[in-house]
A protein has these predicted regions:
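Catalytic-domain carbohydrate-binding cleft regions of carbohydrate-active enzymes
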Residues: 1-166
């Protein structure tokens, strides 16, 4: 796994993630985790999530130890949010910073803009499942109409003096 995806904590670096998130909240901050979801759910990196989703989805979206990313499909989406997102939110994650940059349109649903759909699904999940707070996500611009969902960011930037001088 190349470091751009994954759903579990590196406990060598963060041995007690829930405790860390609580300390951050105790200091008055909100917490967003940056997601690069395109590689799906890997059995090596995220074994508990992989097992739960694989059982629920009956192997439908993956083989060889990986569940592919199929946010277009309601059964995948429900299983993903129930098993992965709810778990992290129960640990203390307040909202999500999606960093989708793989496919402009879905390889499974013709004409469906992937960035727009990620914005729509994550935002509306928060509307439905976290009514105690104002829904918010960070994400890239997903095309016309997507401004209703996310606080946009322009993407990655080079961190050096020539870039600042521009």
């Amino acid at each position: 796994i190349g470091g751009w995806t994954g759903w579990s904590w590196n406990t060598n670096l963060i041995p007690e993630p829930t405790k860390l998130l609580q300390e951050i909240h105790d200091n008055g901050y909100k917490i967003a985790l940056n997601l690069h979801p395109a590689d799906g759910i890997d059995s090596i990196e995220s074994p508990s999530y992989y097992k739960a989703m694989s059982r629920e989805l009956e192997g439908k979206y993956g083989s060889d130890g990986k569940i592919a990313w199929y946010l277009d499909y309601p059964d995948f989406t429900k299983s993903f949010f129930d098993n992965v997102i709810r778990d992290h939110e129960s640990e203390g994650v307040d909202f999500w910073w999606l960093d989708w940059q793989q496919h402009l349109t879905s390889p499974y649903t013709p004409g469906l803009g992937q960035t727009f759909w990620c914005n729509h699904v994550f935002y509306n999940d928060m509307v439905k499942n976290r009514p105690d707070r104002r829904p918010v996500i960070f994400h890239r611009w997903g095309g016309l109409g997507s401004h209703r969902y996310q606080i946009g960011f322009s993407g990655d930037a080079l961190i050096n003096f020539p870039t600042l001088a521009f």
